[in-house]
């Protein structure tokens, strides 16, 4: 007798529930992002304040690990703070602070009421001729230059001259709540509109829910000090399969080149003399990677680039008795990272030029804000106590004065009183060896720069402006008054370097090109993504050029955009276009009379052809190279060093800002209870259905299964 066969597959009722659950999950995954977009408005153009650490402490800001949320309150005048600090009934508050109120006094008030402050969003102010803002300290790089309590104590800690007199030190404070910069005016308007629609009460009364809120994510992984975070990272990387590094040292590369090529595979002979021309590449502000640095960095390194171009055009440079080295130091803002590393490498035979090879040292400080024709020559009074050094410095000053004699737009002036050097890379070299050196700057005492190391040290700060009717290409080639003034300084510098190198025949024919200066200023301060910058870079570096200005923060990923662009700008301005093919350019060792020990070779995009249809790539041969700008403290694992910079940057998982409407605590509690009740009810229903599945869901007979 035939019988029906019993099925051994999954229970049909359970299978139905699984399919239902899968459908719900799938719908959630598909619609989750859509729901999130309807709830939150992301703020995409923001810059956070992040945590930095050194040997002794931490500075900067952070949010809690899950982000900080607060009801938005707009503070347009100081009286508006009262609502945030005492009167407002719905703390914590997310303060939308007008840029002009981002001061030490107001920040101290907010810092003292952390239980009522969830965070801060700062808008961009519009600086005027009388305003000032510098979040840096009044004595930059204090303790890491040449002056100390044991050497030149009368000059230590800026006792005689507060170089950054307007500095409020905010960038070196530690804040327990997140602080973001709102860079987009349209996003700021959206936030203010949300605030006006939902957070303004009637007749002085408290506003009703829902309220407009903001959430900021900027949780930092590192705490306490560099020594602590580096030790934790070291332990993680040693014993963990998936190590979680919590901080990284600030580092990048110095850019350097020689007037005459040298063999970089070995060191120079002791009797070879080198004149050093130096400046810095980096700046910073209170906010991460917002460092326009127009006066504090860009004007000086643009001037040096133009001077290098002018000097290389002199007909007899290959026969000069002395060589000239152009150096662009990275990380000088953070206790002289770049210069201290180069000195360390020179002392330890890791750099082709040694300290004993240095004949003289000329550094460009801040040079774009001359209030008159004067350019001041700063020297070190301590090293000049040595009679030999004093005579060498005197010769150096005389040479500079003579070089400026035929450029009436620049008057080189000596200081009338004994004064310390301003913050400068020269100080790190003087710590290692007495050399004749000078720092050229637009100030005799305190900085003229009212926005030193701030978000407002922009093109406008050094009067780089353009007619409104011009196209970007016309702006690129428009020679501004600032470009002309800096070209004059570059001419004086180039002529001085020529004379210091032993040149005599062509001094007056050396002339910096204002067109070069104006293109560089436009590219670094206004629009990096321009036709000239594109033509001088490799094809794979195009993405480094943004439609806005470049930022000059040293960071931890290197080389940075600024380093690359300066490297290639210097190579194109001072190098020679060869007829090598792309393959030969990338491997010149196979080409007769070409040497990687003497030169660097770069295959760049080149200019457009006459029809503007394709570029004409070319191989540029130059002496431009990169040298590591990582503090020796990290090479030596001396994370608590007081000799070298120990600055490190914390890592983070997510940087995010968004606004949304928030319900009252009571409604949130009710929603939670209702949701929990629904969950419990659904579990009970699911249990009951599953328990009665054999009754509710009857398995169908298999076709053809018949009993007789």
Curated annotation (Swiss-Prot):
<keyword id="KW-0325">Glycoprotein</keyword>
<dbReference type="GO" id="GO:0007215">
    <property type="term" value="P:glutamate receptor signaling pathway"/>
</dbReference>
<feature type="disulfide bond">
    <location>
        <begin position="194"/>
        <end position="212"/>
    </location>
</feature>
<keyword id="KW-0472">Membrane</keyword>
<feature type="glycosylation site" description="N-linked (GlcNAc...) asparagine">
    <location>
        <position position="507"/>
    </location>
</feature>
<dbReference type="GO" id="GO:0006509">
    <property type="term" value="P:membrane protein ectodomain proteolysis"/>
</dbReference>
<dbReference type="GO" id="GO:1900271">
    <property type="term" value="P:regulation of long-term synaptic potentiation"/>
</dbReference>
<dbReference type="GO" id="GO:0071277">
    <property type="term" value="P:cellular response to calcium ion"/>
</dbReference>
<dbReference type="GO" id="GO:0032991">
    <property type="term" value="C:protein-containing complex"/>
</dbReference>
<dbReference type="GO" id="GO:0042383">
    <property type="term" value="C:sarcolemma"/>
</dbReference>
<feature type="glycosylation site" description="N-linked (GlcNAc...) asparagine">
    <location>
        <position position="203"/>
    </location>
</feature>
<dbReference type="GO" id="GO:0061133">
    <property type="term" value="F:endopeptidase activator activity"/>
</dbReference>
<dbReference type="GO" id="GO:0007212">
    <property type="term" value="P:G protein-coupled dopamine receptor signaling pathway"/>
</dbReference>
<dbReference type="InterPro" id="IPR008710">
    <property type="entry name" value="Nicastrin"/>
</dbReference>
<dbReference type="GO" id="GO:0070765">
    <property type="term" value="C:gamma-secretase complex"/>
</dbReference>
<feature type="glycosylation site" description="N-linked (GlcNAc...) asparagine">
    <location>
        <position position="593"/>
    </location>
</feature>
<dbReference type="GO" id="GO:0030674">
    <property type="term" value="F:protein-macromolecule adaptor activity"/>
</dbReference>
<dbReference type="GO" id="GO:0008021">
    <property type="term" value="C:synaptic vesicle"/>
</dbReference>
<keyword id="KW-0732">Signal</keyword>
<dbReference type="GO" id="GO:0007220">
    <property type="term" value="P:Notch receptor processing"/>
</dbReference>
<dbReference type="GO" id="GO:0031293">
    <property type="term" value="P:membrane protein intracellular domain proteolysis"/>
</dbReference>
<feature type="glycosylation site" description="N-linked (GlcNAc...) asparagine">
    <location>
        <position position="572"/>
    </location>
</feature>
<dbReference type="GO" id="GO:0008233">
    <property type="term" value="F:peptidase activity"/>
</dbReference>
<keyword id="KW-0968">Cytoplasmic vesicle</keyword>
<dbReference type="GO" id="GO:0002262">
    <property type="term" value="P:myeloid cell homeostasis"/>
</dbReference>
<dbReference type="GO" id="GO:1990926">
    <property type="term" value="P:short-term synaptic potentiation"/>
</dbReference>
<dbReference type="GO" id="GO:0042098">
    <property type="term" value="P:T cell proliferation"/>
</dbReference>
<feature type="glycosylation site" description="N-linked (GlcNAc...) asparagine">
    <location>
        <position position="611"/>
    </location>
</feature>
<dbReference type="GO" id="GO:0042983">
    <property type="term" value="P:amyloid precursor protein biosynthetic process"/>
</dbReference>
<dbReference type="GO" id="GO:0042734">
    <property type="term" value="C:presynaptic membrane"/>
</dbReference>
<dbReference type="GO" id="GO:0030534">
    <property type="term" value="P:adult behavior"/>
</dbReference>
<comment type="similarity">
    <text>Belongs to the nicastrin family.</text>
</comment>
<dbReference type="GO" id="GO:0007219">
    <property type="term" value="P:Notch signaling pathway"/>
</dbReference>
<feature type="glycosylation site" description="N-linked (GlcNAc...) asparagine">
    <location>
        <position position="579"/>
    </location>
</feature>
<dbReference type="GO" id="GO:0034205">
    <property type="term" value="P:amyloid-beta formation"/>
</dbReference>
<keyword id="KW-0914">Notch signaling pathway</keyword>
<feature type="transmembrane region" description="Helical">
    <location>
        <begin position="669"/>
        <end position="689"/>
    </location>
</feature>
<dbReference type="GO" id="GO:0050673">
    <property type="term" value="P:epithelial cell proliferation"/>
</dbReference>
<dbReference type="Pfam" id="PF18266">
    <property type="entry name" value="Ncstrn_small"/>
</dbReference>
<dbReference type="GO" id="GO:0007611">
    <property type="term" value="P:learning or memory"/>
</dbReference>
<feature type="topological domain" description="Cytoplasmic">
    <location>
        <begin position="690"/>
        <end position="708"/>
    </location>
</feature>
<dbReference type="GO" id="GO:0051402">
    <property type="term" value="P:neuron apoptotic process"/>
</dbReference>
């Amino acid at each position: 007798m035939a019988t029906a066969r019993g099925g051994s597959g999954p229970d049909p009722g359970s299978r139905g529930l699984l399919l239902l659950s899968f459908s719900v999950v799938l719908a959630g995954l598909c619609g989750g992002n859509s729901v999130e977009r309807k709830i939150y408005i992301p703020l995409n153009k923001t810059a956070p304040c992040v945590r930095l650490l050194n040997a002794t402490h931490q500075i900067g800001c952070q949010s809690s690990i899950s982000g900080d949320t607060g009801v938005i309150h707009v503070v347009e005048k100081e009286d508006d703070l009262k609502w945030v600090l005492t009167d407002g009934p719905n703390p914590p508050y997310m303060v939308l602070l007008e840029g002009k109120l981002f001061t030490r006094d107001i920040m101290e008030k907010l810092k003292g009421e952390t239980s009522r402050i969830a965070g801060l969003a700062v808008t961009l102010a519009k600086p005027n001729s009388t305003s000032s803002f510098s979040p840096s300290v009044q004595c930059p790089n204090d303790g890491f230059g040449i002056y100390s309590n044991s050497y030149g104590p009368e000059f230590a800690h800026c006792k005689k001259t507060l170089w950054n007199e307007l500095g409020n030190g905010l960038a070196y404070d530690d804040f327990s709540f997140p602080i973001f910069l709102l860079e987009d005016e349209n996003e700021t308007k959206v936030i203010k509109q949300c605030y006006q629609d939902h957070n303004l009460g009637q007749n002085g009364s408290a506003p009703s829910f829902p309220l407009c809120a903001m959430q900021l994510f900027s949780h930092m992984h590192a705490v306490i000090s560099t020594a602590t975070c580096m030790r934790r990272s070291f332990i993680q990387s040693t014993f963990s399969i998936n190590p979680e590094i919590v901080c990284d040292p600030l580092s990048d590369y110095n850019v350097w080149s020689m007037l005459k090529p040298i063999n970089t595979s070995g060191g120079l002979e002791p009797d070879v003399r080198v004149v050093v021309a130096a400046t810095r590449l980096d700046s910073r502000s209170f906010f991460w990677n917002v460092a326009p640095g127009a006066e504090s960095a860009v004007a000086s390194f643009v001037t040096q680039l133009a001077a290098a171009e002018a000097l290389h055009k002199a007909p007899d440079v290959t026969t000069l008795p002395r060589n000239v080295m152009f150096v662009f130091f990275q990380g000088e803002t953070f206790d002289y990272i770049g210069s201290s590393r180069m000195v360390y490498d020179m002392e330890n035979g890791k750099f082709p030029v040694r300290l004993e090879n240095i004949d003289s040292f000329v550094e460009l400080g801040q040079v774009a804000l001359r209030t008159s024709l004067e350019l001041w020559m700063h020297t070190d009074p301590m090293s000049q106590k040595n009679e030999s050094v004093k005579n060498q410095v005197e010769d150096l000053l005389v040479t500079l004065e003579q070089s400026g004699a035929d450029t009436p737009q620049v008057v080189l002036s000596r200081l009338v009183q004994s004064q310390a050097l301003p913050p400068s890379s020269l100080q790190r070299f003087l710590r290692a060896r007495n050399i004749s050196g000078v720092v050229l700057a637009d100030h005799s005492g305190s900085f003229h720069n009212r926005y030193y190391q701030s978000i407002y040290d922009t093109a406008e700060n050094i009067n780089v402006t353009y007619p409104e009717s011009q196209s970007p290409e016309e702006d690129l080639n428009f020679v501004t008054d600032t470009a002309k003034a800096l070209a004059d300084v570059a001419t004086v510098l180039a002529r001085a370097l020529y004379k210091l190198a032993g040149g005599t025949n062509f001094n007056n024919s050396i002339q910096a090109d204002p067109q070069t200066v104006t293109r560089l200023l436009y590219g670094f301060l206004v629009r990096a993504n321009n036709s000239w910058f594109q033509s001088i870079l490799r094809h794979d570096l195009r993405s480094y050029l943004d439609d806005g200005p470049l930022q000059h923060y040293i960071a931890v990923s290197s080389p940075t955009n600024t380093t690359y662009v300066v490297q290639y700008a210097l190579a194109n301005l001072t190098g020679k276009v060869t007829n090598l093919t792309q393959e030969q350019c990338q491997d010149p060792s196979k080409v007769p009379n070409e040497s990687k020990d003497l030169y660097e070779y770069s295959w760049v995009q080149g200019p457009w052809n006459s029809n503007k249809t394709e570029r004409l790539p070319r191989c540029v041969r130059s002496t431009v190279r990169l040298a590591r700008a990582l503090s020796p403290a990290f090479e030596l694992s001396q994370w608590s060093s007081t000799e070298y910079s120990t600055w490190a940057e914390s890592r983070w998982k997510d940087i995010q800002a968004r606004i949304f409407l928030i319900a009252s605590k009571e409604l949130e509690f009710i929603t939670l209870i209702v949701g929990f009740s629904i969950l419990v009810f659904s579990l009970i229903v699911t249990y009951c259905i599953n328990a009665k599945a054999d009754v509710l869901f009857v398995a169908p007979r298999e076709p053809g299964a018949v009993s007789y």
